Amino acid sequence: MSEYDIAKNDVTYTKLDTIECDIPINEELSWRINKFVNQLRISYSTLEEFVDNFVYELKKGLEAHRKHPNLWIPHECSFKMLDSCIANIPTGQEKGTYYAIDFGGTNFRAVRASLDGKGKIKRDQETYSLKFTGSYSHEKGLLDKHATASQLFDHFAERIKYIMGEFNDLDNKEVKSVGFTFSFPCTSPSINCSILIDWTKGFETGRATNDPVEGRDVCKLMNDAFVRAAIPAKVCCVLNDAVGTLMSCAYQKGRGTPPCYIGIILGTGSNGCYYEPEWKKYKYAGKIINIEFGNFDKDLPTSPIDLVMDWYSANRSRQLFEKMISGAYLGEIVRRFMVNVLQSACSKKMWISDSFNSESGSVVLNDTSKNFEDSRKVAKAAWDMDFTDEQIYVLRKICEAVYNRSAALARGTIAAIAKRIKIIEHSKFTCGVDGSLFVKNAWYCKRLQEHLKVILADKAENLIIIPADDGSGKGAAITAAVIALNADIPQLP
């Protein structure tokens, strides 16, 4: 197939954005690269079908919620379509000091946020690892199946206590409102009650103990931990990072920017939320719907390696879509494709699972250094191997193909949600995007933003995508402010 034919039929290929890598490649290696890269290409027709399937699945999820609110039945819809229970959006005029716990990956943050009432926030925060906590000997730290719920939430409480002490907030008898970003699938009967359905991203805390997290209210677990540690704080809202992104964008977007109706996460995990115009019809208490789209499974353009990845994962046959687009998996997809292309030329470390992470892939994609020194450094660090020029070429082409596919599916997701909202037909609105894949990877960000017009055509100008400023941390604190102030806040229409 000629380069013209590829560009015409493949939405993941654009000559302008293809990595420039002027290294001569022998014919056999070139054939092997194309053999595997072709498994990752997505045609325009495939992406259009993906968007249609996604829109249809959204409608199925809404209908399922109308029949049985807060009960997810997987065979009815792959989306959980959860109620955020958030009825109001911030105006940018909220003031005060609020705290947030941001938990959605292997690290978590304790956040102190001061809102100035003019759409600006001063944030102080501490970041902590949950995998390498010295007090526990579990293989995966506090994310291990042998770690208990009490151990995990006591750790959160102690970190909040520390940052409150740094600002003398422990001496104040006033109970501080805390927003809790808990970025895992939950059912929420109310804004301050959120029951974990199941762990994702390979986390397993409590599964092998009598003190699990799954099936329990994480808000109560957190408040009980505050009581045990004698901390003057109380969780007033639980949300996920996607909802937090929407709330953060709404508060900080600035005057003149259209309203924010979509929040998207593209980081360690992936998810989205949106304003549902017909929320009453489908029996939602809130107007922002948490989609939980990682489990989407309708005619996905999978490769053989995706199926192998799924087979060896902790949650086999679940979250397949997330495994194709999220940062938690992209590095491992790159590694497996590299092993298939290089075969006997691989170092011993290249055969080790998860030895190459998504951050390293981002370095490769954004590498403009002389002789691609940055790419060589991350390859050496990951695999203890000095790459030849040809091998660097392979690495760059594989990274491009893997991340291209992720960006194509992500923009298909955004386009599908925009079509569901229908506001795009007649007016402008904003989509806030957070997560390291988008915010910290300029190459990926460009791919995502430039090509929405492929799907939305002349309506693309009505959708404004902006990077969210710490949706999961600031967004939780902003939501806590909205609830705690109990002000007369304009509601979404």
UniProtKB/Swiss-Prot annotation:
Underlying gene: HK
Function: Catalyzes the phosphorylation of various hexoses to hexose 6-phosphate.
Pfam families on file: Hexokinase_1 (PF00349), Hexokinase_2 (PF03727)
Region (Hexokinase small subdomain): 91-239
An annotated GO BP: intracellular glucose homeostasis
Family named by the database record: Belongs to the hexokinase family.
Keywords tagged on the record: ATP-binding, Glycolysis, Kinase, Nucleotide-binding, Transferase
Known pathway: Carbohydrate metabolism; hexose metabolism; Carbohydrate degradation; glycolysis; D-glyceraldehyde 3-phosphate and glycerone phosphate from D-glucose: step 1/4
GO molecular function: ATP binding; D-glucose binding; fructokinase activity; glucokinase activity; mannokinase activity
Nucleotidyltransferase as UniProt keyword: no
Region of interest (Glucose-binding), ranges: 177-203
CDD domains linked: ASKHA_NBD_HK (cd24000)
Reaction(s) catalysed by this chain's protein: a D-hexose + ATP = a D-hexose 6-phosphate + ADP + H(+); D-mannose + ATP = D-mannose 6-phosphate + ADP + H(+); D-fructose + ATP = D-fructose 6-phosphate + ADP + H(+); D-glucose + ATP = D-glucose 6-phosphate + ADP + H(+)
Top-level lineage group: Eukaryota
Name used for this protein in its record: Hexokinase
Residue span(s) of domain Hexokinase: 27-481
Region ranges (Hexokinase large subdomain): 240-470
EC code(s) of this entry: 2.7.1.1
Annotated organism of origin: Plasmodium falciparum
Residues where ATP binds: D102, F103, G104, G105, T106, N107
Gene3D superfamilies reported in the protein's UniProt record: 3.30.420.40, 3.40.367.20
Annotated Gene Ontology cellular component terms: cytosol; mitochondrion
